[in-house]
Structure formats: C-alpha cells, structure tokens
Amino acid sequence: MPALKVIATPIGNIEEVSPRVKAALTKCEVLFCEDTRVTKKLLGLLGIDFSNKQFIINNEFKEKQNLSKVANLIHQYHCGLVSDAGYPSVSDPGHILVEYVRTQLPQIAIEVINGPSALVCGLVTSGFPESPLLFLGFLDHKPTQVTQTLKHYQNFQGTIVLFEAVHRLQQTLEVIQTVFSNTEVFVGRELTKLHESHYWFNTSAPLPDITLKGEFVIVINNHHTQPVGQYSDQLLKQEITQLVQMGVKVKDACHYLAKRLQLKSNKLYTLFHESD
C-alpha cells in the first residue's frame, strides 16, 4: 500500500536520528521539505546520496499548492514529508498535506517515522506535571495578541508549553510575568544542542539572565495551589475511588492526588477510610 512517510528530524543533535529515520530518508525518492537546503544538509551529514531525489518546498506559503503534486507523485514514488527540525505539523508546515492525504487519498497510508520533539523534551526537562497539558506552539507576532492569548488561558489548570523566537523571548516572558502571578516557569534554550541551557524562575521574581541566542521552549506550571478546604471531601473521595477502580492501590492513589493537588497524602488516606 502506498504511503506518505511523515518523518521527524533532529531538533539539535544529529545522533537523534534513529536507524528507522535514516532508512526512511534513504528510501524516499520525493521529499516535501520546509527548507530544501536544510534537508539536503541533513542528508549529507547522514551520508545519504540525494543526487536522484526530488525536493519540493513545503513551507507555509507553498503547502496548499503541493496538494495536487502529492496526489500525482505518491502513486509513482516513495514520498516523505519533513520539516527543518522535529515533527512536521507540530508548529511547522505539514498538517494541510497530511489532512489532504487522509481525506482525499484514502488508499494512501500515513506512516509517522518517530523521532525527537522539542515539546516533549522541554516538558520532561522542566520537571512540571505532564497533565493536563496545553500546547500553544508559537504565539502571534503582535504583543497585544500575545497578551490576549495568554490571558485567555490564564485559568487553565495545568502545564502550558509554547515556543518562542529569540527576538521575542524577553517580551513574551514579561507578558507571562504579568498574566501568571506566583507561577513557576521553565525556559529551555537550544535543547539537545551543544550549548543547551536551562532556566527556572518564579513570575514573582525578576527574570533570569538568559542568553538571547538560539531557539526556546517555555513551560508554565499553572497548577495552582489551593487550601484543602477548597476541595470538597466528596470530590476528593470520588477521585481516589476512580483511581482505585482502575487498579491503583489506595496508598498510591492518595500519593498521586496529593502531588497533583499539592495536598497531604496522609490526610487523603484518612479521609478515604473515614466512612469505612
């Protein structure tokens, strides 16, 4: 069955390329690329001969124009979709092409070739709870729109991840300070690259001295602390019961819930057994 291979590429370190990714890049005769120069450089570093490959620019301006091309090419050649770094369609071009194949070419499979993700890397490095999770990607270029977007999600109870360019980082962090009070924030710079660096700070404190160079992932820990009294006993028992019904031990369920809601595990354990 013909397939469109959606291939994740390194976000910084060339060694992030798995044998499966390399095999897919080698096999593809046609590559839809965010930037053909970047893709050719990657293939060169991997020792892949691309002299007989066809490269088609697939950036935000060209993606819709490529729909007819993929329809014609995918029945004749092995076709792949790549972005400059990470996964196509995750804050990069790609989803329009994938959606077209899914809806208009049902006889064509969509095969994702897994690899690195700045979203996952930033989230894991932050050490913040992984769920609920809200991913905003790159925000609007206009400062007023950035403020409006972040205020819209101000009351989201969870972890928020976004990407930012170096020339807008300082401005965006200042908006985050204004919108999210007394909140932990992580900034990852040049993740998996040689000069990778990490910064943690609280929005109630001054911004750290961040090297303004490279690419950035921002993670906001918007899990708000609340006094025990603000959670009803009935709701807490219900949450523990649901976890137990899923096969989780009572002690582990209480520990998990206590960590998530920033409560005392022993108090939850006592509360759960009060009616026993």
Swiss-Prot record:
UniProt main location, coarse: cytoplasm
Superkingdom, natural source: Bacteria
InterPro entries reported in the protein's UniProt record: 4pyrrol_Mease, 4pyrrol_Methylase_sf, 4pyrrole_Mease_sub1, 4pyrrole_Mease_sub2, rRNA_ssu_MeTfrase_I, SAM_MeTrfase_RsmI_CS
CDD domains xref list: RsmI
Compartments (UniProt record): Cytoplasm
GO molecular-function term, one example from the UniProt record: rRNA (cytosine-2'-O-)-methyltransferase activity
Function: Catalyzes the 2'-O-methylation of the ribose of cytidine 1402 (C1402) in 16S rRNA.
Protein's UniProt name: Ribosomal RNA small subunit methyltransferase I
Organism of derivation: Mycoplasma pneumoniae (strain ATCC 29342 / M129 / Subtype 1)
Gene this chain is encoded by: rsmI
